[in-house]
């Protein structure tokens, strides 16, 4: 198996128990739902939306084996394995590979600000060398608003040139289409076997036209079916469907994204345990829940009227 299939991915939210530990079985069932009925071609657990940096190392190390035991599709799961500690990133990446999940999403080391390009290069080079597996497929994780550690385009090109297929692509969470296009243009995008994934489904058609591979988004936890409807439509129906995608994305952006996606899953599943957040994040307030519920009802009414 090589790289992950292209398409629409959800940056999956994570369910926590009362003690703050991740509930692996519940996460697996949820990811299965996303791919079977939730409109997703794949899932990216333990990323930002999944509160990955708030999950213990022991839980993160155990997840890939649990996914493998549940026979989750190896080419449709991209585990977040980043850590500021190079050794921890190596261990997490090895755990994914040992379970048959070759595709990983790697944040840059984000604690020390303004690292040099050489320092960032060294971080990824050491991970690749210490993991020592040609089957590894790394998706660089560009999220400058949160990590405060952007990937210069020239560095991405250098990593791809030096490590070939191991540097499989990049998730661009900048929210800036011009930035996503710059990464695709510099690497050749899908034609150059470098898969760029913007983080907003609102730009899905522009992204695909620019040579990107799909979308990895937090709001596709709830709205991926709308994206698939737009992709399968044509003519005026496509324009209408894309507008529905944009409205849904704008609705999600009105709220703390992780808390909102968890609240939506709690409503869908009838399981309020989904609203648990890892500190410092908190669940939606009662006022936010009421507003979100009203916004979702309005979205559903608009969708029904358009059918």
What are the residue ranges of the model-derived segments?
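Catalytic alpha/beta core domains of metabolic enzymes, predominantly
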Residues: 132-135, 144-255
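C-terminal alpha-helical cap/extension of soluble enzyme domains
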Residues: 4-14, 33-40, 212, 219-307
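A structural signal for short hydrophobic/aromatic patches embedded in well-ordered alpha helices
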Residues: 63, 123, 159, 241, ...
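Active-site beta->alpha loop and helix N-cap motifs at the rims of alpha/beta catalytic domains
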Residues: 2-150
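Glycine-centered loop/turn motif at secondary-structure junctions
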Residues: 38-39, 100, 163, 191, ...
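A general structural signal for well-ordered alpha-helical segments in protein cores
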Residues: 27, 60, 64, 89, ...
